[in-house]
Curated annotation (Swiss-Prot):
This is Arginine kinase. Its EC number is 2.7.3.3. ATP binds at residues 122-126, 185, 229, 280-284, 309-314. SUPFAM superfamilies: Glutamine synthetase/guanido kinase (SSF55931), Guanido kinase N-terminal domain (SSF48034). It catalyses: L-arginine + ATP = N(omega)-phospho-L-arginine + ADP + H(+). The lineage of its organism: Eukaryota, Metazoa, Ecdysozoa, Arthropoda, Crustacea. PROSITE patterns: PHOSPHAGEN_KINASE (PS00112), PHOSPHAGEN_KINASE_C (PS51510), PHOSPHAGEN_KINASE_N (PS51509). It comes from the Eukaryota. One of its GO terms (molecular function) is arginine kinase activity. Residues 9-91 form the Phosphagen kinase N-terminal domain.
């Protein structure tokens, strides 16, 4: 059971949320008094409480979601809060629904979406994974961070062929290596205020690191927001090549590192927005005509469940008509379906852009 000091902090946080009339987070929407009373004294076997779940959203009232899972068990123990938030965010993934089993499908169904190279600047597919037997960031000890990093780096050092590469720990990294990784846009920084408030950045930079292959088309982040972020990317529009590389990497890593998986929610991640397939397939794409007709762009994006962001990701502008466009849906469909929906949408956008020229 949670101790008295934690419960007192929770009561205070709940009052703050209640008083914040302009707060629009899913946390505020679904943390009703009855849900709060039901969960405030619960504690996972690793010692995580409701405070670990909600503290980022309490501190940052401008959060969109406002909750994180401190460990895998939290998704079950605090389900009365997580389930409605998951249903709301992953439109229509109801509390009775079950995420399908992993299915990368026929990898040869994916193509180069822009063979002429006129529209797509680069293509990227990533997924997140958590290592079984370890909690998520807020509950990890310094020793666990080190242990996880050594497991990950030794697993990655066994990769062969085009996945073969080098692991760079953030601890003790030289300025030269750091600058090189920044120039390649590979280096991740210490978490933003949302992650800081969720206690996701403790013992930084212990246990954190970056692996990339020699061609710089395959990347693994160790202990950034999730235990593992596995990323495949390259210039141009060859989604097929990018997807096949990711699938072979995930399968290779999975042979050596067991991943946390939930019967109902799929692959588990620190943030509930990434659950399920955890897959985000995206392109940087130039659409000058559609950029001038934002309504049409949003209409097509809506039809194919695409998320349109500015050039540098969330909350940024499109520079020179370049957008970051990705699949929006991660839950209740297979990996294959998520990426296929994105491919169909991008092909349609390019077709319309050509017609408008």
């Amino acid at each position: 059971m949670a101790d008295a000091a934690t419960i007192a902090k929770l009561e205070e946080g709940f009052k703050k949320l209640e008083a914040a009339t302009d707060c629009k987070s899913l946390l505020k929407k679904y943390l009703t008094k009855s849900v709060f009373d039901q969960l405030k004294d619960k504690k996972t076997s690793l010692g995580a409480t409701l405070l670990d779940v909600i503290q980022s959203g309490v501190e940052n009232l401008d959060s969109g979601v406002g909750v994180y899972a401190p460990d895998a068990e939290a998704y079950t123990l605090f389900a009365p809060l997580f389930d409605p938030i998951i249903e709301d965010y992953h439109k229509g993934f109801k509390q009775t629904d079950k995420h399908p089993n992993k299915d990368f499908g026929d990898v040869n169904q994916f193509v180069n979406v822009d063979p002429d190279g006129k529209f797509v600047i680069s293509t990227r597919v990533r997924c997140g994974r958590s290592m079984e037997g370890y909690p998520f960031n807020p509950c990890l000890t310094e020793a666990q961070y080190k242990e996880m990093e050594s497991k990950v780096s030794s697993t990655l050092s066994n990769l062969e062929g085009e996945l073969k590469g080098t692991y760079f720990p953030l601890t003790g990294m030289t300025k030269e290596v750091q600058q090189k990784l920044i120039d390649d846009h590979f280096l991740f920084k210490e978490g933003d205020r949302f992650l800081q408030a969720a206690n996701a950045c403790r013992y930084w930079p212990t246990g954190r690191g970056i692996y990339h292959n020699d061609n710089k088309t395959f990347l693994v982040w160790c202990n950034e927001e999730d235990h593992l972020r596995i990323i495949s990317m390259q210039m141009g529009g060859d989604l097929g090549q990018v997807y096949r590389r990711l699938v072979s990497a995930v399968n290779e890593i999975e042979k050596r590192v067991p991943f946390s998986h939930h019967d109902r929610l799929g692959f588990l991640t620190f943030c509930p927005t990434n659950l399920g397939t955890t897959v985000r397939a995206s392109v940087h794409i130039k659409l000058p005509k559609l950029a001038a007709n934002r309504e049409k762009l949003e209409e097509v994006a809506g039809k194919y469940s695409l998320q349109v962001r500015g050039t540098r990701g969330e909350h940024t502008e499109a520079e020179g008509g370049v957008y970051d466009i990705s699949n929006k849906r991660r839950m209740g469909l297979t990996e294959y379906q998520a990426v296929k929906e994105m491919q169909d949408g991008i092909l349609e956008l390019i077709k319309i852009e050509k017609e408008m020229q």
